Curated annotation (Swiss-Prot):
GO terms for molecular function: ABC-type heme transporter activity; ATP binding; ATP hydrolysis activity. This is Cytochrome c biogenesis ATP-binding export protein CcmA. Residues 8-212 form the ABC transporter domain. The gene is ccmA. GO terms for cellular component: plasma membrane. It comes from Aromatoleum aromaticum (strain DSM 19018 / LMG 30748 / EbN1) (Azoarcus sp. (strain EbN1)). The complex is composed of two ATP-binding proteins (CcmA) and two transmembrane proteins (CcmB).
Amino acid sequence: MVKSTPMLYAADLACLKGDRLLFRGLSLHVAPGAMLRIAGPNGFGKTSLLRILCGLAHPEAGEIRWNGRPIAGDRESFHRTLLYLGHAPALNDLLTPLENLRFACAAAGDDVDEDACVDALVRIGLADQLDLPARVLSQGQRRRVGLARLFLGIRRSLWVLDEPFTALDAAAVADLATTLSDHCAAGGVVILTTHQDAPFAVPPTVLDLSEVAA
């Protein structure tokens, strides 16, 4: 899909969910600075593919390489280069957004100070919810807590995002699109699913799973 040397390479992937084969023979390469959008109807395996590319799920067949090395050989090192945000962020309902964000960063080994976390949460639209317990947040607000990690300048080369624009207003969509574009401009890689159009600096390459479905 990209002609320059790939950072992420996958060959002949197959995905089985229950007794249903979602896709097979799926190959892709993503070069430094590229953004890849995974498209396709619901039920075609978009989230499953993201989890496979992150090493969080095993493919039925095929191989994934990061910078030329199979991720299966050293998942721990691979995960240190990865920032994955699923569609349902795991939050502790007893903690505030700020506490949840700081906990997530610490768990991932990222050293981020409190002021930076506050700034990120304000930027994503949670200024009025900083001190509220997560249990009272809406689903959209819960997602924003997870997305705030993208505004912290964390040095992770590969960002994998499942529907990051859901429940964001137009200003937040534009701000997030700029952040993703900036990450790619700095040589990072973004792989995402989204049903929304976003004002990216460069339109992403699209992989449509309906074209490779089993």
